[in-house]
Amino acid sequence: MSRNAPNGCVPPSQATAPPSPATSLRLTVGEPVSEPATESGERVLQDGFWEHGRFYGSWKPGKYLFPIDKEELNRLDVFHKYFLVARDEKVTSTPLRKDGRPKIMDLGTGTGIWAYNVVEEYAKDAEIMAVDLNQIQPALIPRGVTTKQFDIEEPSWDPLLRDCELIHMRLLYGSIRDDKWPHVYRKAFEHLAPGIGYIEQLEIDWMPRWENEDLPRHSALQEWAQLFQRAMHRYHRSVTVSGEATRRRMEAAGFTDFSETTIRCYVNPWSPDRHQRECARWFNLAFSLGLEAMSMMPMIDKLGMTKDDIVDLCSRAKKEMCILRYRAYCTL
């Protein structure tokens, strides 16, 4: 698909991802091979299983409820591009040192694209540990970056980097058990450099709101968000975002000097503002690519829905997202 789709929206049958803005990251799903990487640097996934038409990781099954196939990795890279556009091309808002070799951890790194972006364009001498439950990062990585397969719900973080100037987390709601968040923040606090360390977390509230009073009579997007929240709540891995609750948890872990920024993630480019339209195009693409991936395991396992029901719901939600008079947005 071209960068600018018709009306800036993604037809449900044509949702494909553009090239990633930094390192090209791709996943090849195939039979096990003796070497972990191909000549092109693509990683061949060896451990996992197919379910509901998608490929899932098999290390600690049930902890990460979303697929790790090529389509999903493309979606994660598109979301990275959206975050860059929405935040004025800033890969982080943390004031990192330009001299020396700052230590950074990226928790829930996914494809690793954020970590690679930091070391290639922002802090070239940084030492970065990119941590994830799944080994879905490419075999060829920039100098200064190491990848680590690790479950951050584990009691001990001894294998992880210490004295960090920044610990970065993004889109981890739904991946961490509700009762484990205090532990995650406490361990993050312990692994930051005293007096100079920062934690930075970005989450999206998927429940749509509307800019005006022109609302769909029966919103498929709202129905999807309600069902998704309900299913994830039954896993005790909530995706309901509360800045106040997050702040209380961080304060209890020892953090101080908070800064919170809210950005509206418009689902289509209705705005006359050029930057808002560009943001909306990328968010529409990323959201459209992810609807079914986010839905299949939770809604089938916890709500008893069928795959056909979910495909129909997601298709209706995608179509609604492309109607420009419905000025819906999520919040970042």
Swiss-Prot record:
- Alphabetical list of InterPro entries matching this protein: SAM-dependent_MTases_sf
Which residues are connected by disulfide bridges in this protein? none
Q: Name one GO molecular function term.
A: methyltransferase activity
Q: Among the record's GO biological process terms, what is one?
A: methylation
Major site of localization recorded for this protein:
nucleus
Subcellular location(s) per record: Nucleus
Give the keywords, sorted: Methyltransferase, Nucleus, S-adenosyl-L-methionine, Sporulation, Transcription, Transcription regulation, Transferase
- The record's top EC class is transferase
Q: Which reaction does it catalyse?
A: L-methionyl-[protein] + S-adenosyl-L-methionine = S-methyl-L-methionyl-[protein] + S-adenosyl-L-homocysteine
Subunit and partners: Component of the heterotrimeric velvet complex composed of LAE1, VEL1 and VEL2; VEL1 acting as a bridging protein between LAE1 and VEL2. Interacts with VEL1.
Record protein name field: Secondary metabolism regulator LAE1
Lineage of the organism:
Eukaryota, Fungi, Dikarya, Ascomycota, Pezizomycotina
